[in-house]
């Protein structure tokens, strides 16, 4: 009888904790968010295929696109990788001097202090566009994986079509 009472007590505590987390939007119930003001930001510069500089309140802010990894072009001590220039040029062509919206996931910054975001150009997520064009690999660092399935599906389409980095 004592084992049953202890089990019920533990279950009740777990339920209370989960309810508290649900009410506060915390723990497993924490959601990603777009910029709370719904503002768009001017892309001032493209660093490489998956990193941009935006103007946020008059300050430059470095933004790393979540869920994609483009071939390197500017990484110190690393040679320019195949399709790196193509990915950088594609991002420059589509985002430079454009206004974008940012959608954040669970962790807003990476260990280098860059803002982590899904970048929206109109109603299209640019992160997906890079993967769909075969200019980026799907790459996720949990817990930032809200659009994992969508980006991985875009990569599979590019692989099937043998686009760019998936060319044989």
Swiss-Prot record:
A cellular component term, taken from the record's GO annotations: extracellular region
EC number(s) stated in the UniProt entry for this protein: 3.1.31.1
Enzyme active site: 64, 72, 114
Keywords: Calcium, Endonuclease, Hydrolase, Nuclease, Secreted, Signal
Tagged with keyword Nuclease: yes
Signal sequence extent: 1-27
Broad enzyme group: hydrolase
CDD domains: SNc
NCBIfam families recorded: TnucaseNucIStaph
Name of this chain's protein: Thermonuclease
The organism of origin for this protein: Staphylococcus intermedius
